């Protein structure tokens, strides 16, 4: 049960903000939030009244199974490598979730991965990642992870069998069995693709590198419990946020985002440039989220933001956007609390 009470004047003074309307304190499972004018706080962490800007992508979900959970994970990890951002990678990809043997077509443990990019590039990426990273991994099999897909990606791996391949049925699914050195590779050759959403994000500002990092890890762990999303960067965390272009090097398409670099806060101010680093902030980490739908990304952002705010030392949560020029999806931080 939620209980609400008006904040006392001393509480307002403690937070250093003038009155712009009603002040409320809401208590719920030891987590509290309140609104101060346009400022929001959750569990004592400032939540900036801004939004992340998402854009449409095509997403393929591939289920990878193996004789053990460990081998399925190794194959899934390989298949999602070099896929953090389409700024410099051919796609964005990550492990979505573990799937127990009772829920896979061949009754073996597995993982689902999401591969996200443009429609044309997606066909190439699914084929290349399955053929080079999963086919080559011991005991693996591949199945389509999308039901009711909008597009079909034919990966045609059976030709690798050089006419020694054969059609088989696995769990009621038509597949190919390709003979390989380690036995037989089972693959469902038609992988579905749907219209997904990329670009969900939020930034965690901490009073130390470790507080920000622990909060980022907590956020990623919480997001991992949400179906239909991935956090494509290493460990789900972005350490080197970038801006479009460069202030000093014309040949650079992207460069460090000095607004969010704590170590040069004073230098940025001295140059007359803007900084987004409040006093006392020592580190910033960003969480980027891609998903199969707008709803999935919203749920992931909410789970991640709230988890991050539960970590001591987190000062502020904000998000990155391009003023509506990047994409049609708006993920407001106020909806995360």
Language model region names:
Residues 11, 16-18:
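Short hydrophobic alpha-helical segments enriched in small aliphatic residues
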Residues 40-49, 53-98, 113, 117-120, ...:
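Conserved mixed alpha/beta catalytic, RNA-binding, or beta-rich assembly cores of soluble enzyme
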Residues 102-111:
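Glycine-rich phosphate/pyrophosphate-binding loop regions near the starts of catalytic domains
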């Amino acid at each position: 049960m939620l209980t609400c009470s008006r904040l006392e004047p001393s509480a307002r003074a403690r937070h250093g903000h003038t009155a712009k309307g009603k002040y409320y304190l809401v208590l719920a499972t030891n987590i509290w939030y309140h609104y101060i004018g346009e400022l929001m706080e959750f569990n004592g962490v400032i939540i900036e009244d801004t939004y992340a800007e998402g854009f449409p992508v095509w997403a393929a979900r591939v289920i990878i199974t193996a004789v053990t959970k460990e081998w399925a994970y190794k194959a899934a990890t390989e298949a999602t490598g070099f896929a953090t951002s389409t700024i410099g990678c051919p796609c964005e990809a990550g492990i979505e979730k573990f799937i127990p043997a009772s829920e896979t077509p061949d009754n073996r443990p597995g993982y689902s991965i999401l591969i996200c990019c443009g429609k044309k590039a997606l066909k190439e990426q699914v084929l290349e990642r399955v053929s080079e990273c999963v086919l080559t991994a011991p005991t693996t099999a591949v199945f389509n992870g999308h039901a009711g897909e909008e597009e079909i990606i034919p990966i045609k791996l059976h030709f690798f069998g050089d006419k020694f391949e054969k059609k088989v049925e696995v769990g009621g699914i038509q597949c190919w069995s390709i003979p390989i050195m380690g036995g037989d590779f089972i693959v469902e050759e038609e992988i579905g693709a749907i219209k997904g959403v990329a670009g969900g994000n939020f930034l965690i500002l901490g009073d130390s590198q470790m507080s920000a990092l622990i909060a980022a890890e907590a956020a990623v762990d919480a997001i991992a419990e949400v179906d239909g999303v991935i956090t494509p960067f290493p460990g789900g965390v972005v350490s080197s946020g970038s801006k479009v272009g460069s202030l000093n090097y014309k040949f650079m398409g992207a460069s460090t985002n000095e607004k969010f670099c704590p170590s040069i806060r004073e230098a940025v101010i001295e140059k007359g440039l803007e900084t987004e680093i409040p006093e006392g902030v020592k580190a910033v980490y960003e969480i980027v989220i891609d998903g199969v739908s707008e709803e999935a990304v919203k749920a992931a952002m909410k789970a991640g933001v709230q988890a991050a705010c539960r970590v001591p030392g987190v000062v502020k949560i904000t998000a990155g956007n391009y003023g509506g020029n990047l994409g049609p999806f708006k993920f407001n931080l106020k909806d995360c609390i």
